[in-house]
Design a protein with these regions (language model features):
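Short acidic/polar, Gly/Pro-enriched loop/turn segments located at secondary-structure boundaries
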Residues: 1-126
Length: 126
């Protein structure tokens, strides 16, 4: 008999520069979390990541954070510039809250699909 292959479940966490890991929700109930310079807004099509608006938020906004999807998971998120990212199982994406100047680069380990309002100068490093 063939084994049933189940799709990945929505699971991911943010790994902060300090090494702290914060689980991202998958409830779709529009909760908001404020973490180290960013606001995470749960939407039905993924978590929207926005820079916070306080001065302290802006001070850490240039730091890069990891979004990590463990093995067997999948996750959809929307970067601060509106780019949609579908991260597959066992993948990591590193991104800044603010892209500085014309450099719009993210770093990917694993597999992801990018879409939405991507501009031509968007770059994925591996």
């Amino acid at each position: 008999s063939m084994d049933t292959i189940c799709p990945g479940y929505k699971q991911a966490y943010i790994e902060l520069k300090s090494g702290e890991r914060i689980a991202l929700g998958n409830t779709g109930n529009k909760q908001e979390k404020r973490i180290e310079g960013m606001v995470l807004k749960e939407e039905k099509d993924g978590v929207m990541i926005l820079p916070g608006d306080s001065l302290a938020d802006k001070a850490v906004a240039v730091e890069k954070s990891w979004i990590v999807v463990p093995r067997g998971g999948e996750y959809q998120l929307i970067l601060p510039d509106g780019t949609k990212v579908w991260l597959n199982s066992d993948s990591k994406l590193k991104f800044p809250l603010h892209f500085v100047g014309n450099q719009r680069a993210v770093y990917l380990e694993g597999e992801a699909f990018f879409g939405g309002r991507m501009r031509q100068d968007f770059c994925v490093d591996r």
